[in-house]
Amino acid sequence: MRDLEIKKYKKLNELAQSDGIVIFGEGTDTNIPLCELRQALGVDKKMYNRSFSELSIHDAVNVFDACISPIAPETVFIHIGESDITAFKGNHSNFDIEYRALIKHIREQNKKCRIAVISIKHTDNNPDVEEMNQHLKYIADSEKCEFGDLTVQKVWNPKATMQTSSFIRNMGFVHPIKTPKPLYDLIRVLFCSEVCA
């Protein structure tokens, strides 16, 4: 399955532009409606979803090189770990080492790349997921990445934001603001919207 996904993303990369925003995730991340959210919210950066149905942190560096490195992203949202819960229970330190190695690898490719580590959703109050999220927060903090905590129950309402954006444009601000949006705001839009819930 992953080989087909990699092949698809390599083909899409022929159309992609560099310096965009990339979601590097797994599971339900493959269904995030990037085009619609980007258009509705006036995000001026190109956005690409390079998520896989299943992806372990163990394979992440190789997959990054095949599918993401060629488009030289300005921002990467890493949302990996769901497939690693069993391995994490057995050995926390290997998970931490491989996650840090991925972040280091991304920075070696582009020193200015903004990186956000996204927590794993856990609706069933699984203590292993809770512990993994604590590790992800520590990794993000120690590696100077932003941390997107999806365990905080805040649902982003894209319709209200779209109405606000429309009002601002109608008041004479025709073009979206060109300054980079705070990563946490984008995390809320992409991973916590009613559309994706």
Language-model segments: which ranges?
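Short, contiguous clusters of charged residues that form electrostatic/catalytic patches at enzyme active sites
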Residues: 58-62, 97-104, 134, 181, ...
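Hydrophobic beta-strand segments of well-ordered beta-sheets in folded domains
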Residues: 21, 74-76, 114-117, 147
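Conserved SGNH/GDSL esterase-like catalytic core that processes O-acyl groups on lipids
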Residues: 2-97, 127
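Catalytic His-Asp segment of secreted/periplasmic serine-dependent ester chemistry enzymes
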Residues: 123-197
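Charged, glycine-enriched surface loops/patches
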Residues: 93-118, 135-145
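Active-site segments of SGNH/GDSL-like serine hydrolases
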Residues: 79-85, 107-131
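A generic secondary-structure signal
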Residues: 11-12, 63-70, 101, 105, ...
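Residue-level recognition of beta-strand->loop/alpha-helix junctions
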Residues: 51, 119, 149-151
